[in-house]
């Protein structure tokens, strides 16, 4: 009593305390960062190594394997995958969520240093690493286009100036430049002219290397002056290389221009980029794991004026994609839902109380509780994201409950003629324990969530803490500010003035009277009610088993990723045309706003596309519906496939695959893997539960396999190294010299002329000059024939691996897809030497699925323990928890009705319902116990009286919670697909629970009271 009186009798102190909470919350709100979701990125580090000209199998065995053995010893690595392709190896290390990425980076560097001695000596550079996840969608894509500058020059500006500056921005991990390559002097050799002049390709290479050197020449010092010695030892342009003498033939000089075409071009001509149908160079910007997208994008945009000023005016620098607008729009929608929820909740209170003064009290309590939460969010390092704002939206219906219970009870005493100050003290004292029980038991629901490990635990920690803090502040406000305002604002009013909204008052009274009559009948037919209650328990089990499940609601972020996979033997020219064709088809879709893409590099049969959709206000289809519409058009393109996936704010794993979900096959024997992977892929392609099934196994590339006749070579005086050098010089785009410029270094690239790289018959024109100076055609000592060769070799851990990727068809669920995959693997009879496992998001989904029921049971057990402690009873918590089955049925039926799968968001809705619906039972049980103890009523009369007495606050708090969640259900803007499952679950559960628990709770109370009376004579107790 003294505690409550302290605040009621000191209104100034209570008001100032409230203002302090509000002010600190406003400051905290202004300091909070903005992000789409809580920080749940796994620490991922990418290791890169290169050895130009090496085939994929050589890269895998000589580079990937030694590095994997060293990196695999690092503590905290939970997944290590590698891909080795022509001349390059990439190893992805995914660490535990708890691992600090900077500490992991130091361990990676130490492992690379330790493995250096095991790597081939021919590597031009040491392996490097970056703190980035290659599977994460870029946060921004910029394009450079120009009508006057070449693609190589644009690439030079992009890599030398723009990429360097952008990479220095806080939060940026990598800036990948695509669509071309650095400028270079290309020497395109004519094999026939070389043969006629008796000059080998290697002689040309040596002559160019010797003619372009950069060495210190020293200085000259006299007694009075100092001179630096500088010679024209470098050749920097194609014009300078043309007259270079490379050989003398019978005393006549053979110049480079006599046997080759020398042009200013690019290092790798097998690269192409496009944006909206025009050639373009792309700047693909990725963030560090854990970096805030909005803050990073804002920093990059702030640099845009300086970036544009650093390049010529005839070059256009545009932003083709930016992930931040849809994130901001989604957060704006959540904030709008929050405001609507507050307004609806206050409207509910006004309709019930029918008094402006009375409504003002919860109208103050709700925003104070919500605003005060921002302080705790800032101190905990949280952000304003979809989940934390959804927590506040849902909290609107919770935080008003405490104020309503206190306000309604004080109003009841005022209507009985008690003075305001006495009514406030008496009213808050009577329901103080009830409010405390409701709040503590609601917070207890989130304890299992806070203790949950892995990605789901990290994902919902902010949600749980934010909601718990809001409830805690609401508890304080309802026991301090609310009774103080009641004592000073409320007055007993004449009956006529109370009924300002007469229609609603009459309806409410009629409902209450009808409830009393129906409850009286129910209490006389308790067996039927128990049958209904037991039926809801069974129905819960059946609905949970049958409902489709998924990991996380598929978001429409307005961005899509496209991955092109063509025939493994396709040429670069044909692949470039495929890119153009696919971009044309996608660009023609009315929902598409912008398309960029590129192809080339080490894998000539693949390409990437980045698609921006129009804002939701300008299109009627979701991203998934756009993909479904495009899928039919894209299937008509022969020789290649384009796989489209909507960009998600959360993606698990470091694999860069062609679809959203992955199933990995592992084997110690590469031959077994190559035998079974096509069979598994073919079986999965037939499953209707899957779409866009594809594989990263690339073992059917075309190669020309040469067989050396070593005896003939020995007789002719030719070494294998001479023959290999010939092939590398002719077809390897070999970088044979370096041109040094102030801002960058450029290469001299040697290769046969383009017409000779497009026909296998060019091998007949190749020759080697032996030790006797004779020109020996390649065909004299080698034979060749077509064969298959891998374009890439993949590992997971130290095992050979192949990842089959898939998407879901429109309306499909991940649970149905994973179950179908497991059935297919069983029916195929895959041997034990080939192991199958889900990876990435699919793996986390399966792990989460196993723990969902345990999580719900843990929440129920926690609430039971808390209630048992509060009531000093084993029985009364069971009465209160009997409200849960009906809520579960309502939630699951609502999800089925709206065709929404059961996701992590829906799981949180179920957890919230555990906390919400038991409030009704707490109010009934608490008043019934008080009536039995102090009013000398029997159990039936006590629970009947309590049910009628608390009917109005029960109805009010339920409607407040329902209307607080309603804006999430009806939302239709950006991010609605993330909010709707939570709202649907809560609204469905509340409606069903309200209809049933008003009857089941009194019946269960009576049953347990009879059991208590039969087995124990201990008097009823309630903690004060």
Curated annotation (Swiss-Prot):
GO cellular component, one term: plasma membrane
An MF annotation (GO) of this entry: xenobiotic transmembrane transporter activity
Keyword annotations of the record: Cell inner membrane, Cell membrane, Membrane, Transmembrane, Transmembrane helix, Transport
InterPro entries reported in the protein's UniProt record: AcrB_DN_DC_subdom, Acrflvin-R, Multidrug-R_MdtC
Subcellular location: Cell inner membrane
Membrane spanning stretches: 12-32, 333-353, 360-380, 387-407, 431-451, 463-483, 528-548, 853-873, 875-895, 897-917, 953-973, 984-1004
Topology term for the membrane: Multi-pass membrane protein
Recorded family membership: Belongs to the resistance-nodulation-cell division (RND) (TC 2.A.6) family. MdtC subfamily.
Assembly behavior: Part of a tripartite efflux system composed of MdtA, MdtB and MdtC. MdtC forms a heteromultimer with MdtB.
Name by which UniProt lists this protein: Multidrug resistance protein MdtC
């Amino acid at each position: 009593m003294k505690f409550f009186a302290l605040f009621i009798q000191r209104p100034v102190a209570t008001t100032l305390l409230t203002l302090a909470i509000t002010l600190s919350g406003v400051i905290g709100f202004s300091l909070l960062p903005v992000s789409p979701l809580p920080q749940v990125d796994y620490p991922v580090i990418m290791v890169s190594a290169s050895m130009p000209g090496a085939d994929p199998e050589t890269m895998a065995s000589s580079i990937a394997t030694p590095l994997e053995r060293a990196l695999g010893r690092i503590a905290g690595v939970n997944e290590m995958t590698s891909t080795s392709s022509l001349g390059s190896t990439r190893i992805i290390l995914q660490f535990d969520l708890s691992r600090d990425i900077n500490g992991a980076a130091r361990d990676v560097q130490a492992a690379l240093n330790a493995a250096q001695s095991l790597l081939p000596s021919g590597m031009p550079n040491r392996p490097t690493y970056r703190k980035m996840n290659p599977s994460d969608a870029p946060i921004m894509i910029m394009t450079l286009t120009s009508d006057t500058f070449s693609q190589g020059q644009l690439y030079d500006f992009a890599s030398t100036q723009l990429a360097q500056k952008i990479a220095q921005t806080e939060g940026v991990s990598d800036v990948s430049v695509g669509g071309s390559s650095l400028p270079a002097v290309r020497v395109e050799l004519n094999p026939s002219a070389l043969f006629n002049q008796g000059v080998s390709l290697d002689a040309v290479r040596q002559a160019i290397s010797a003619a372009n050197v950069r060495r210190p020449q020293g200085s000259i010092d006299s007694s009075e002056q100092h001179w630096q010695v500088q010679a024209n030892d470098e050749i920097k342009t194609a014009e300078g290389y043309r007259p270079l003498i490379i050989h003398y033939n019978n005393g006549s000089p053979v110049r480079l221009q006599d046997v080759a075409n020398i042009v200013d071009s690019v290092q790798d001509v097998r690269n192409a980029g496009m944006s909206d149908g025009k050639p373009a160079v792309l700047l693909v910007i990725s963030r560090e794991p854990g970096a805030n997208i909005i803050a990073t994008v804002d920093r990059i945009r702030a640099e845009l004026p300086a970036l544009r000023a650093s390049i010529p005016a005839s070059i256009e620098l545009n932003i083709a994609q930016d992930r931040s607008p849809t994130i901001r729009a989604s957060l704006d929608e959540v904030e709008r839902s929050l405001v609507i929820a507050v307004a609806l909740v206050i409207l509910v209170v006004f309709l019930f109380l029918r008094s402006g003064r009375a409504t003002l009290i919860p109208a103050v309590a709700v925003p104070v509780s919500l605003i005060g939460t921002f302080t705790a969010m800032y101190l905990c390092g949280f952000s304003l994201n979809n989940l934390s704002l959804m927590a506040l939206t849902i909290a609107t219906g919770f935080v008003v409950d405490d104020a309503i219970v206190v306000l309604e009870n004080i109003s009841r005493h005022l209507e009985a003629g008690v003075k305001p100050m006495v009514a406030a003290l008496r009213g808050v004292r009577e329901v103080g324990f009830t409010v405390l029980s409701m709040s503590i038991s609601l917070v207890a629901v989130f304890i299992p969530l806070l203790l949950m490990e892995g990605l789901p635990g990290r994902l919902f920690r902010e949600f749980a803490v934010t909601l718990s803090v809001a409830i805690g502040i609401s508890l304080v406000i309802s026991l301090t500010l609310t009774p103080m305002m009641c004592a000073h604002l409320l007055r007993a009013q004449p009956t006529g003035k109370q009924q300002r909204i007469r229609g609603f008052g009459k309806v409410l009274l009629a409902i209450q009277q009808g409830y009393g009559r129906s409850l009286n009948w129910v209490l006389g037919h308790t067996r039927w009610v128990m049958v209904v209650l037991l039926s809801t328990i069974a129905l819960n089990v059946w609905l949970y088993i049958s409902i489709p499940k998924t990991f996380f609601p598929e978001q429409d972020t307005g961005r899509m990723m496209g991955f092109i996979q063509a025939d493994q033997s396709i040429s670069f020219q044909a692949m470039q045309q495929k890119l153009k064709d696919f971009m044309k088809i996608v660009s023609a879709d009315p929902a598409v706003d912008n398309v960029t893409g590129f192809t080339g590099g080490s894998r000539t049969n693949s390409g990437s596309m980045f698609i921006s959709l129009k804002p939701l206000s300008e299109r009627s289809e979701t991203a998934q519906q756009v993909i479904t519409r495009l899928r039919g058009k894209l299937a008509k393109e022969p020789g290649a496939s384009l796989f489209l996936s909507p960009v998600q704010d959360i993606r698990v794993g470091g694999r860069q695959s062609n679809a959203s979900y992955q199933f990995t096959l592992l084997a110690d024997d590469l031959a077994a893997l190559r035998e079974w992977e096509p069979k598994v892929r073919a079986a999965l392609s037939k499953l209707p539960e899957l779409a866009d099934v594809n594989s990263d196994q690339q073992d059917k590339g075309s190669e020309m396999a040469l067989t050396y006749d070593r005896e003939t070579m020995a007789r002719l005086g030719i070494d294998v190294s001479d023959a290999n050098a010939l092939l590398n010089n002719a077809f390897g785009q070999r970088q044979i010299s370096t041109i040094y410029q102030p801002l960058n270094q450029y290469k001299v690239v040697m290769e046969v002329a383009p017409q000779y790289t497009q026909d296998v018959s060019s091998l007949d024109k190749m020759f080697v000059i032996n030790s006797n100076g004779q020109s020996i055609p390649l065909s004299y000592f080698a034979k060749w024939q077509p064969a298959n060769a891998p374009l890439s070799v993949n590992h997971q851990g130290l095992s050979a691996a192949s990842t089959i990727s898939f998407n879901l068809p429109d309306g499909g669920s991940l649970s149905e897809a994973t179950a179908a995959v497991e059935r297919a693997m069983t029916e195929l009879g895959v041997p034990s030497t080939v192991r199958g496992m889900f990876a990435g998001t699919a793996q986390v989904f399966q792990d989460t699925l196993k723990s969902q029921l345990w999580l719900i049971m843990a929440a129920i057990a926690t609430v039971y323990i808390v209630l048992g402690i509060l009531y000093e009873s084993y029985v009364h918590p069971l009465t209160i928890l009997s409200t849960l089955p009906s809520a579960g049925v309502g939630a699951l039926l609502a999800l089925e009705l709206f065709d929404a799968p059961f996701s992590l968001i829906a799981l949180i809705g179920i957890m919230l319902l555990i906390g919400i619906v038991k409030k009704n039972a707490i109010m009934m049980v608490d008043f019934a116990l008080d009536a039995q103890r102090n009013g000398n009523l029997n159990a039936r009369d006590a629970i009947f009286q309590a049910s009628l007495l608390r009917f109005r606050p029960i109805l009010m708090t339920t409607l407040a919670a329902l209307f607080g969640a309603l804006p999430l259900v009806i939302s239709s803007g950006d991010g609605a697909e993330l909010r709707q499952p939570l709202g649907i679950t809560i609204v469905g559960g509340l409606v069903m629970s309200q209809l049933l628990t008003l009857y089941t709770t009194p019946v269960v109370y009576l049953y347990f009271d009879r059991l208590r009376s039969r087995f124990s004579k201990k008097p009823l107790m309630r903690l004060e």
